[in-house]
Amino acid sequence: HVSKAAANQHLWCGAHLVEALYLVCGERGFFYTPNKVGIVEQCCHSPCSLYDLENYCN
């Protein structure tokens, strides 16, 4: 069972983005390079869900 919150679209920027990645990825960790095109464009400039964030987990 997946909560509705995980599917909600949000703008994730800066520290909020990193916190959300920690939450979603847990011990797997994640690949985060703020200068690289990708997660910031997908999740800060336009809304994305926690499902989208999970694509950036290791």
Swiss-Prot record:
Pfam families, per database record: Insulin (PF00049)
Coiled-coil regions listed: none
GO biological process: glucose metabolic process
One of the record's GO molecular function terms: hormone activity
GO CC terms of this entry: extracellular space
Disulfide bridge positions per record: 13-44, 25-57, 43-48
Cellular location(s): Secreted
Domain of life (superkingdom): Eukaryota
Gene3D superfamilies recorded: Insulin-like
Key words, A-Z: Carbohydrate metabolism, Disulfide bond, Glucose metabolism, Hormone, Secreted
Family per similarity comment: Belongs to the insulin family.
PANTHER family: INSULIN (PTHR11454:SF9), INSULIN/INSULIN GROWTH FACTOR (PTHR11454)
Described function: Insulin decreases blood glucose concentration. It increases cell permeability to monosaccharides, amino acids and fatty acids. It accelerates glycolysis, the pentose phosphate cycle, and glycogen synthesis in liver.
Oligomeric form and interacting partners: Heterodimer of a B chain and an A chain linked by two disulfide bonds.
Protein name: Insulin-1
UniProt organism field: Huso dauricus
